[in-house]
Design a protein with these regions (language model features):
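Short, well-structured active-site flanking segments
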Residues: 21-22, 156-167
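Intrinsically disordered, low-complexity regions of eukaryotic proteins
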Residues: 22, 71-72, 94
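Membrane-proximal, proline-rich intrinsically disordered regions
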Residues: 15-66
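Sec-dependent bacterial lipoprotein signal peptides
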Residues: 1-13
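Primarily recognizes Gram-negative and organellar outer-membrane beta-barrels
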Residues: 29, 67-73, 78, 109, ...
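Conserved, well-structured interaction surfaces
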Residues: 37, 41, 45, 49-54, ...
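Short linear capping/connector segments at secondary-structure termini
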Residues: 25-29, 130-134, 166-173
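Short, solvent-exposed turn/loop segments enriched in Gly/Ser/Thr/Pro and often Arg
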Residues: 58-72, 76, 156, 163
Length: 183
């Protein structure tokens, strides 16, 4: 009887590389040709796509705009109570609000993507020779830094002191003051 499960496990296991494929829309870091300047915009495009998808979501947007005078949450004070607290900056009462914790993760996803893009742009910059290509690289880096700064702007406005990650190599992360983040 023990031979049947053993035979079945041997027949169903395989040495194929079917599961070792890269996810779609990804590139191995080792496979990037940083001498091909026509690909230099790709990491920037990734940041735009990430920012659009993660900072432009309806849940994130609700947490951001309800704090100003752009919109009122409407309804009674107990209707969507989380947005009522957010509009009054009472974030200590929102410790389990899914949209707020989602915004935290979304902002740091933009930060992480931006850090990776800046690292790629630095690698492209090492191989650029013409002044116009160097200026274009600097422009792309500025666009990426804008999105990272915008994500941090939202983070410090919502949470106060937050970890400042300027690269994706940090292992020990600590909170930085709002003032340090805004520099």
């Amino acid at each position: 009887l023990w031979a049947i499960p053993l035979a079945f496990s041997l027949l169903t296991s395989s040495c194929s590389d079917y599961l070792d494929k890269l996810p779609e829309n990804t590139v191995e870091v080792e496979g990037i040709d940083y001498t091909n300047k026509s690909n230099m915009y790709m990491p920037v495009s990734g940041v735009y796509a990430t920012a659009r998808g993660y900072l432009g979501s309806w849940s994130s947007y609700g947490c951001i705009i309800v704090r100003g005078d752009d919109v009122n949450k409407g309804g009674s004070p107990t209707d969507q109570i989380e947005y009522e607290y957010a509009s009054k900056f009472q974030y200590d009462r929102l410790t389990t609000f899914w949209a707020l914790s989602g915004l935290w993760g979304n902002c740091y996803y933009v930060v992480s993507t931006s850090n990776s893009a800046l690292e790629s742009l630095e690698n492209y910059a090492k191989h650029l020779t013409s002044e116009s290509d160097k200026q274009l690289n600097a422009q792309y880096a500025a666009e990426v830094r804008f999105f990272r700064a915008y994500a941090y702007f939202q983070l410090v406005n919502l949470f106060g002191d937050v970890p400042l990650l300027l690269d994706n190599q940090e292992l020990n992360v600590f909170k930085n003051t709002k003032e340090d983040v805004k520099k």
